[in-house]
Amino acid sequence: MAKKVAVIGAGVSGLTSIKCCLDEDLEPTCFERSNDIGGLWKYTETSKDGMTRIYWSLVTNVCKEMSCYSDFPFQEDYPNFMSHSKFWNYLQEFAEHFDLLKYIQFKTTVCSVTKRPDFSKTGQWDVVTETEGKQHRAVFDAVMVCTGKFLNPRLPLESFPGILKFRGQILHCQEYKIPEGFRGQRVLVIGLGNSGGDVAVELSRVAAQVLLSTRTGTWVISRSSNGGYPFNMMITRRCLNVIEQVLPSCFLRWINERQMNKRFNHENYGLSITKGKNPKFIVNDELPTCILCGTVTVKTSVKEFTETSAIFEDGTVEENIDSVIFTTGYVFSFPFLEEPLRSLCMKKMFLYKHVFPSNLERASMAIIGLISLKGSILTGTELQARWATRVFKGLCKIPPPQQLMAEVTKKEELIKRGVIKDTSEEKLSYIPYMDDLAACIGTKPNIPLLFLKDPRLAWEVFFGPCTPYQYRLMGPGKWDGARNAILTQWDRTLKPLKTRTVSSDSSKSASLSHYLKVWGAPLLLASVLLICKSSHFLKSVRDKLQNRIFPYLVL
């Protein structure tokens, strides 16, 4: 008999979890509290149901070739970066293509998920749900929690003295949909993540003035890289990842700063990272121009509010503020879980490889999608789901809970003593994390073997963008179309741009430029790697670089 799996949520994580269950001959039942799939990608004009929804103007930050399910590429005529409606259409196409909708119970809320009395032997769960006021109870062999990390808005009013006496409008960006209601206003946006940048830019078109407050600053990246290619495809490459493992961290920071400041000097624009803070970046094509034109003014963090104004940490005061929009992120929660499991899952370090709670006697629960990646979360959740379903089926193993808890407890103690840094809330490096999960499944690409068997494919895998199709080339879940998808990924990237016929001379020039842009840097880096293959040589170079560069970094 097939094992029964409860999937909580039908967003990007839930949909791939349903499919992965079917791929492993498991029996999924998905519970979705709204009336449709897509989670936050399903746009609605209001958020009265308490669910997080996106704003109307949202555009994806990761290009289509880097943010698709690994065996279901976007249609070639889809734009590289798309509107929320286009992305939701893709999710609908995915669900229909793999016939996933029949496994979803809509307008159903999960009330509780508790261990069965014989959990230590069976790993089973009691799941109580509610549909139209009626409760139902069922037993499942495993549970996949796919509610994501955008559940509850984080509104830290207690951190802003005087905010309660402020007379203007106060809201979280979860409630923001369109800019029209702010026409002619002076608006203060607090927080500079991707949402903060987007909201500030959009408001600048109708508001009298937009003030953008940030504590730490940020690097601002454009969606188009050198030559106009999607930046994700240019920077997310295995060859570059190898180089990052070799070069000293101080040298990498220096290179990154130079690269980031090529487009514009972040310090001049008030965006440079506060000294001692972890570097972060946002994707925004228009923010620098808005700052340059004066429609957006960057400010330091807010010290306190009065009835009509905001006083900032640098002593400046902005009067007559009409609205304050907090873009301060979200707090994830698992209200349906029992204690102490609920509290443990709230600490990411207690999730083995960000998926399995460390304290469970049986690995029959997986938290899917609770990750921050320097890349597409969708592709990360798919690999998590592929791994989790194979663990449920007994095809993959994880260490016993005693070992996992001992390791985490030791790490927690070292963090408290200041011996090591807590990195559980930092964004994970994309390729290392994806490869780690793929190795657990048995789908990590074998680059040396590929160079022997299929040099053309190996070249694209190692020097080209690390697209999700790479994790379908071999092992469990192998997809026959993966090779072709990789070799044609640049064709699908350029297809939506080819809307005007150009002369043959221009085409040849563009083609040459394309190959120089795409392969020039990887070839140069490959040459460096070949020269530096001796570990002794690497050590000496690293020491010399450290000694020569460090004094300049200090200055």
UniProtKB/Swiss-Prot annotation:
GO cellular component terms, A-Z = endoplasmic reticulum membrane
Q: In which tissues is it expressed?
A: Kidney and liver.
Q: Which residues cross the membrane?
A: 515-532
For whether the record's keyword set contains rRNA processing, the answer is: no
Where is it mainly found? membrane
* Flavoprotein found in the keyword field: yes
Q: Keywords on this record?
A: Endoplasmic reticulum, FAD, Flavoprotein, Membrane, Microsome, Monooxygenase, NADP, Oxidoreductase, Transmembrane, Transmembrane helix
Q: Which family does it belong to?
A: Belongs to the FMO family.
Q: What does this protein do?
A: This protein is involved in the oxidative metabolism of a variety of xenobiotics such as drugs and pesticides.
This protein's name: Dimethylaniline monooxygenase [N-oxide-forming] 4
Q: Gene for this protein?
A: FMO4
